[in-house]
UniProtKB/Swiss-Prot annotation:
Belongs to the FHY3/FAR1 family. Keywords: Metal-binding, Nucleus, Zinc, Zinc-finger. Residues 277-373 form the MULE domain. Putative transcription activator involved in regulating light control of development. A zinc finger (SWIM-type) spans 556-589. One of its GO terms (biological process) is regulation of DNA-templated transcription. Its main location: nucleus. Residues 1-36 are annotated as: Disordered. This is Protein FAR1-RELATED SEQUENCE 11. It comes from the Eukaryota. It is found in: Nucleus. Residues 62-156 form the FAR1 domain.
Length: 680
């Protein structure tokens, strides 16, 4: 006989306790567990035997479960006999192998979906039967039947722990998991953190990733109406703690949550400086509620993605998109971006045209390219990569004429005349092709590196594992973490010594004004400018590489007004002067980049000014007072030299022109009037 109890053929039965055992009987009843410990007979390596005594039926169950785990199977409570109210109460219990019985055949019901679930039951006859004995007022349970013959393979010790009966999540671990979920980390990351905390090898926790997902899913299965109420209460709670937090929502005819949008104080402050170009990513859904999720993001002066706002919509129709855009511009004090980049969505396109008529709408190229494999891979086959390379070449061309000719040749070469995706791409070319977009500011968000950073930033919001009400908190955690990381990155960049490559006064001046990130972009153009020659013509300059005999870019420069422009339109597109314009400035003995070509959005911004502005953001009167103080300081500082005065006059004129383009409210006029009366 084998020493392994799991492989022994043991069948014991007490003839004095003969009752039939049908493992197909599913009418088992489970009682509440008792707190009694195992009897002294239940030593670790013990095997059940006839006549074995237990104080309670739960103690017997624990003993048999320990034996089963050691053997390589698990058990379940099967059937009880002598139930309360029938006579003597509960008198007999059966514990069986988890593979006992057979799966009943379900009848197919028309119109009802059937779950294709596999069963592990195979008619195994292994069991333990215990009977209740009462003597002299004392109750105990005695083993009256035991069989350890299995008709299936038993599991190894490293396998048996995966059986559901031996997997459990303690209350302490549940609390940790729910706390982790609020931070938005993935289930895999939760598992790894718990493994490190408990000092166990990977995969040796008493539960699996599936158990964690089921736990988190159980917290989502709430009444949708309760979810909506909790979500709105959460937003209101945040609003009470932070008055600068903003949110808007709509209810349908049944008073159920239809749409909701929100933004944080730090996001609104960032938008004031960096909201000129915005990505509105609407390609994701929030799994907790299966609602389309829209996220507004941008890029700050250090080239780091920054969060502007979120929206959840029930439907993706024109009405919903219009509401979302109205809510967003409302958060941002009516200021619409210069450029907004989105996925290809006709309803969204129409909504942008209606709600943001002065905003340039463009398509995110990485969202478009992400659909290419499903659109073209099958049709082009081995030629797909060649076609994709040609597409990128056309995408980066500088002139519309070159693009149009190249596109026609590409369609002919690859035989794509009847391809509907090619036709749709061509019809929307003004929304994604760089030759059509170079005159619009995109803050470099079409670059591959920048798009990857933005996409990675957005993914941080999509790992939310818990309820809808927690999602707004999770987003806040990610935003706060990103803000802190950005501040640290900003400090590190500012502490680094900037290496000047040309030694030109223009370079050192730009280095003192721009952030290290922005300066590195301008510095690239400054270095390249030395390789270009400029030729003065009747209308401006012609600039081309010193090795070229023809072609080039046309540069127009008006020194008296400090205005310069180039036909390559790099400044209009990215906010950095191009090599061609810098070459002309150098030729004209200009030792500083004109201030208007060092945009505020790429400059080093005073932290103290930013904080002062934030603290006064809610009180209109205080903001007017702050502005008056700034103007007074501006006048006193500008009067110290002619150069300072010239700069102040020029920049103030530009600022006034921009201000006069903005709408005026009657409330603001009254506040200004009262403020002026108080101060004069």
């Amino acid at each position: 006989m084998s020493d392994d109890p799991g492989q022994m053929l043991l069948i014991y039965d007490d003839p004095s306790d003969q009752r039939s055992l049908s493992l197909d009987d599913a009418s088992s009843t489970e009682e509440s567990p008792d707190d009694n410990n195992l009897s002294l007979e239940a030593v670790h390596n013990a095997i059940p035997y006839l006549g074995q005594i237990f104080l309670t039926h739960d103690t017997a169950y624990e003993f048999y479960s320990t034996f089963a785990k050691r053997c390589g199977f698990s058990i379940r409570r099967h059937r009880t006999e002598g139930k309360d109210g029938v006579g003597k109460g509960l008198t007999r219990r059966y514990f069986v192998c988890h593979r006992a019985g057979n799966t009943p055949i379900k009848t197919l019901s028309e119109g009802k979906p059937q779950r294709n679930r596999r069963s592990s039951r195979c008619g195994c006859q292994a069991y333990l039967r215990i009977s209740k004995l009462t003597e002299l007022g004392s109750t105990e349970w005695r083993v009256t039947g035991f069989a350890n013959h299995h008709n299936h393979e038993l599991l190894e010790p490293n396998q048996v722990r995966f059986l559901p009966a031996y997997r459990s999540i303690s209350d302490a671990d549940k609390s940790r998991i729910l706390m982790f979920s609020k931070t938005g980390i993935s289930v895999q990351q939760m598992m790894r953190l718990l493994e490190l905390e408990k000092c166990v090898e990977p995969g040796f926790l008493p539960f699996t990733e599936k158990d964690v997902r089921n736990l988190l899913q159980s917290f989502k299965k709430l009444d949708p109406e309760d979810e909506n109420i909790d979500f709105l209460r959460m937003c209101q709670s945040i609003k009470e703690k932070d008055p600068n937090f903003k949110f808007e929502f709509t209810l349908d005819a049944n008073d159920k949550l239809e749409n909701i949008a929100w933004s944080y104080a730090s996001s609104i402050q960032s938008y004031e400086l960096f909201g000129d170009a915005v990505v509105f990513d609407t390609t994701h859904r929030l799994s907790a509620v299966e609602m389309p999720l829209g996220i507004w993001v941008g890029v700050n002066n250090y080239g780091v993605p920054c969060f502007f706002g979120c929206v959840l919509l029930r439907d993706e129709n024109l009405r919903s998109w219009s509401w979302a855009l109205q809510a967003f511009t409302g958060f941002m004090n009516g200021k619409a971006p210069q450029t907004i980049l989105t996925d290809h969505n006709m309803c969204l396109k129409e909504a942008i045209a209606g709600e943001m008529p002065a905003t340039k709408h463009a398509l995110c190229i990485w969202m478009v390219v992400g659909k290419f494999p499903s659109w073209f891979n099958a049709g082009l086959g081995e030629r797909y990569n060649d076609w994709k390379a040609e597409f990128y070449r056309l995408y980066h061309l500088e002139s519309v004429e070159e693009f149009e000719l190249g596109w026609r040749d590409m369609v002919n070469s690859f035989g794509l005349h009847t391809n509907r995706h090619i036709n749709n791409l061509y019809a929307s070319r003004s929304l994604w092709s760089l030759p059509y977009l170079r005159s619009h500011f995109l803050a470099g968000m079409t670059l591959t590196g920048r798009s990857k950073a933005i996409n990675a930033f957005i993914q941080r919001f999509l790992s939310a594992q818990t309820r809808l009400a927690h999602f707004v908190e999770q987003v806040a955690v990610v935003v706060d973490f990103k803000d802190q990381a950005t501040e640290q990155q900003t400090m590190q960049q500012n502490l680094q010594n900037i290496s000047l490559k040309t030694g030109a006064p223009m370079e050192s001046h730009a280095a003192s004004v721009l952030t290290p990130f922005a300066f590195s972009k301008l510095q690239e153009q400054l270095v390249l400018a030395a390789h270009y020659a400029s030729f003065q013509m009747d209308e401006g300059y012609l600039v081309r590489h010193h090795t070229k005999l023809d072609g080039g870019r046309k540069v127009y420069w008006v020194p008296q007004e400090g205005i310069i422009s180039c036909s390559c339109q790099l400044f209009e597109f990215s906010g950095f002067l191009c090599r061609h314009a810098l070459r002309v400035l150098s030729t004209g003995n200009c030792f500083q980049v004109p201030d208007r070509y060092l945009p505020l959005r790429w400059r080093r911004i005073s932290t103290s000014f930013s904080k002062t502005f934030r603290s006064n953001a809610e009180d209109h009167g205080e903001r007017v007072q702050l502005l008056q103080n700034l103007v007074s300081t501006l006048v006193s500082e500008s009067a110290k030299s002619k150069e300072r005065l010239d700069i102040a006059t020029e920049q103030t004129s530009i600022l006034l022109s921009r201000i006069r383009e903005q709408p005026v409210s009657s409330l603001a006029i009254r506040d200004i009037s009262s403020s002026v009366q108080r101060n004069f």
